[in-house]
Amino acid sequence: MAHNNIEYAETIALKAVKFILTDDETQKSFITTTGILPADLEIMVKDLNFLGGVLDFLLANEDKLLEFCTNYDINPEEPAKIRRLFPGASYD
């Protein structure tokens, strides 16, 4: 079920942050890729640019994306659909 509101999109992105932080391998990859440390996340999670970047991180790794979607019972197409609601989305 696709949703086109930012509140829903933020909820999914925050679940993605939780998923990233609870898996050591994914967390290390996220830190290496972004340079953002877990201690900085309390402030960062309020930034829509950051939340869009979190979705980009998962969208770039299909295995992790599918694991996230399975864990949270989310349609695997949903993160890509809601990504466009955040700043910096690519429309190609």
Question: What is the role of each PLM region?
Answer:
Residues 1-92:
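Metal- and O2-centered redox machinery and metal/ROS homeostasis
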